[in-house]
């Protein structure tokens, strides 16, 4: 359902992040396939999140192919637009 169905969607998140839970529910409710990567205890993933967010630990950070964007605070309209999925179920 994304712009390019061949591009994998990766969501970098933490266990205690309410915005991450909202984003995950949003994606699941719309049938969007994605891989979740927890950055806690994962120095490589945390480093990537810091690098793509100008040194800030912003979660969730979403990767689509080579493109990254932070969805923090959670914004359903932004996420729907970025992934070309319906805003409403």
Language-model regions, residue ranges each:
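Local sequence-structure signature of Cys/Sec-based thiol-disulfide redox active-site neighborhoods
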Residues: 2-33
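Small/polar loops that bind or transfer phosphate-bearing groups
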Residues: 12, 37, 41, 71
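Short, charge-rich, low-complexity interaction segments located
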Residues: 47-51
